[in-house]
Curated annotation (Swiss-Prot):
GO molecular function per UniProt: ATP binding; CCA tRNA nucleotidyltransferase activity; magnesium ion binding; tRNA binding
Species annotation: Saccharolobus islandicus (strain L.S.2.15 / Lassen #1)
UniProt key word Nucleotide-binding: yes
Listed name of the protein: CCA-adding enzyme
Top EC class of this enzyme: transferase
């Protein structure tokens, strides 16, 4: 059976666990006498082999406030691990990523609160998530979560960060708790039609997102608020096709694809000079993608697709047009002859005539008709960056090939 094959690949071995424990021993020594806990998928037993990020939360009394976490707590943590390979990262507040033996450990300062619904920062709920999941999943349930995570990774809908807008690890755990197993999740997801409500607890507010899973530890929060409609639809379609024809391709899609260039494709390569929060950068990139598409359409280009990919330092924006060539002049459609606005139209336009339909027309010159210039002008990054741009002729870049192909390998 496909699932059993996949599980053999993704389920950690005893050796894997020992390797993680050795890393944790180093962290425990450094954080000695602090109030800390191991959280996340490792603690819950739902982690995937060779895909391990350990979450360690250092708790401080809630009375010290959020500002204390950003300054005092962070400095205290850095002083304890400063001789290790570490970097600063940013979410709601800064935290530290330590790399030990190729294992990333996120050390996150948080406030110790009485319950999940009393959270002051988003991470304060985490220990309550851990308790909820570990009390509702047995060993088989943990394996079912692993299968669901790998399936979502394979089809590209895993990860709640803004760059992906997909399902978080916690969301996958709740789906298994609610439906019972991997196959049952797929059976139900294949029938989804938004808005979808999955209630392990009664919500404490009205949610407007397409997929609603009220957080069992804080019912005022929707666990899947970040999941885009695109990713919900992708997951539903993938579930339907997997149930019809199970294949390992859903879990581990083919990396090498080939596709010819259709239309005209502009590639923009951005290299960021400054480090910034991933969510901040990708918020600006997503706004840039939308702005580029809107501007090109406004100037008369027929846009096939605009997408972006990369990390926080190197980003590619690909713009696919039916054609990059567009006329310098265009037909401007005016009002009907009886409209009160005809005088204004006549005053503002040249080359005016009355059409067979009784409507006024004119010829107008486009303010801009170079697609590359328009695209560059509509990048809204607030950090400094260098840009390289070119029109695609051919490529061996697999990300660009994926963009050109469109169809996921699991679909066809």
């Amino acid at each position: 059976m496909i699932e059993e094959e996949v599980l053999k690949i993704i389920k950690p071995t005893e050796e894997d666990k020992k390797g993680i424990e050795k890393v944790l021993e180093i962290i425990r020594e450094r954080l000695n006498k602090l109030d800390f806990e191991v959280e996340g998928s490792f603690r819950k037993g739902t982690w995937l082999r060779q895909d391990t990020d350990i979450d360690v939360f250092v708790f401080y009394p809630k009375d010290v406030g959020k500002e204390y976490l950003e300054r005092n707590a962070l400095n205290d943590i850095i002083n304890r691990i400063k001789d290790l390979d570490y970097t600063l990262a940013y979410a709601e507040h800064p935290y530290v990523i330590v790399n030990i033996n190729n294992v990333e450990v996120d050390i996150v300062p948080a406030l110790r609160v009485e319950s999940g619904d009393k959270a002051i920062t988003a991470v304060d709920r985490t220990p309550f998530h851990t308790k909820y999941v570990t009390s509702h999943l047995d060993e088989r349930g943990k394996d079912e979560v692993r299968l669901l995570k790998r399936f979502m990774k394979g089809i590209g809908v895993y990860g709640a960060e803004l760059k992906v807008q997909g399902f978080s690890g916690y969301a996958t755990e709740l789906l298994i708790i609610y439906y019972g197993n991997f196959r049952k999740v797929l059976e139900e997801a294949s029938k989804w039609k938004h808005p979808i409500k999955i209630e392990l607890t009664k919500p404490m507010k009205i949610f407007s997102e397409p997929l609603i899973i009220p957080d069992p530890v804080d019912p005022k929060r929707n666990v899947t608020a970040a999941v885009s409609l695109k990713n919900i639809a992708t997951f539903s379609i993938a579930a339907k096709y997997y149930l019809k024809n199970p294949s390992i391709e859903f879990f581990f899609p083919s990396k090498k694809v080939e596709e010819k260039v259709k239309g005209d494709v502009l590639i923009l390569r951005l290299n960021l000079d400054e480090k910034s929060s991933e969510d901040i950068v990708w918020g600006q990139i997503k706004r840039s993608v939308n702005k580029i598409e809107r501007a090109l359409k406004q100037y008369g280009f027929r846009v096939i697709d605009v997408q972006a990919w990369g990390d926080t330092n190197n980003i590619t924006i690909a713009v696919q047009l039916e054609s990059k060539n567009i006329g310098q002049y265009y037909l401007n459609i005016g009002p009907q002859y009886y409209s009160e606005t005809i005088e204004d139209f006549i005053q503002k336009n040249d080359n005016i005539w009355v059409g067979e339909d009784g409507r006024l027309y004119s010829i107008k010159e486009r303010k801009e008709y170079d697609a590359e210039t328009i695209a560059k002008k509509n990048i809204v990054l607030k950090v400094k960056y260098n840009i390289e741009s070119y029109w695609l002729q051919n490529t061996e870049d697999q990300q660009i090939m994926k963009f050109l192909r469109k169809t996921p390998t699991w679909l066809k």
